[in-house]
C-alpha cells in the first residue's frame, strides 16, 4: 500500500467492496447494475491539475455522470468525493474574510483557474442537479492533501499537483 500501513483486510469482501474499472466507459459502469450494493462511493479521479488532453473532464466529469446514471437507474445512493478547491481562487478577485463556504454552495462568483478545478466543479454540478430530481447523494469535499509528517512521503503524481508546484516555486524564488 502506498499511503497507509493498515490494509483494512477485515472489511473487504464483507462491508467494503473495491471495484476496479473505467468510469469513462458507460457500458462498463452499467455492468454494475447487477452487483448488490446500497451505496456507491466514488473516489475515482484524476488529480492532476494540468493535462494536455481532455482526460480531466472525461474522468472527473463525464465519469461521474455515468455513475449518476447508474445510481438513478438502480435507486442507489452516491457519495461523490470532491475537493475544497471548487471554492476557486477568489470571489470577484477578493474573498471576503467573513465568507463561509457551506455544503450546498457551488457557484458564488468564484474564479475557477484550472482544468482540474473545473472538472470537479462540473461533477458537483451534475450531482447537485441529479439530487434535485431524486438521486440520494452526498458530496464530500476533501481538503488539500499533504505529505506525511513522519517521513515526508507524498502522492505519486507530485509533479502535477498544483499546490505542491506552487510551494516549490516559492521555495525556488526564495533561494
Regions found by a protein language model. Name each.
Residues 58, 62-115, 136-138:
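Conserved Rossmann-fold NAD(P)-dependent oxidoreductase catalytic core, especially the SDR/UDP-sugar
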Residues 51-55, 89-93, 150-151:
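Short, solvent-exposed loop/turn and secondary-structure capping segments
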Amino acid at each position: 500500500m502506498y499511503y497507509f500501513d493498515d490494509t483494512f483486510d477485515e472489511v473487504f469482501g464483507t462491508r467494503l467492496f473495491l471495484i476496479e474499472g473505467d468510469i469513462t466507459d458507460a457500458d462498463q459502469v452499467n455492468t454494475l447494475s447487477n452487483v448488490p450494493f446500497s451505496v456507491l462511493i466514488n473516489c475515482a479521479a484524476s488529480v492532476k491539475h494540468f493535462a494536455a488532453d481532455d482526460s480531466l473532464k472525461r474522468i472527473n466529469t463525464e465519469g461521474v455522470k455515468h455513475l449518476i446514471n447508474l445510481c438513478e437507474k438502480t435507486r442507489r445512493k452516491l457519495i461523490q468525493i470532491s475537493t475544497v478547491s471548487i471554492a476557486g481562487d477568489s470571489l470577484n478577485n477578493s474573498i471576503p474574510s467573513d465568507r463561509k463556504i457551506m455544503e450546498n454552495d457551488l457557484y458564488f462568483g468564484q474564479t475557477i483557474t484550472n482544468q482540474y478545478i473545473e472538472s470537479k466543479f462540473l461533477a458537483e454540478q451534475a450531482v447537485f442537479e441529479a439530487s434535485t430530481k431524486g438521486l440520494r447523494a452526498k458530496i464530500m469535499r476533501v481538503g488539500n492533501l499533504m505529505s506525511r509528517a513522519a517521513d515526508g512521503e507524498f502522492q505519486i503524481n507530485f509533479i502535477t499537483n498544483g499546490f505542491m508546484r506552487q510551494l516549490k516555486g516559492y521555495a525556488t524564488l526564495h533561494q
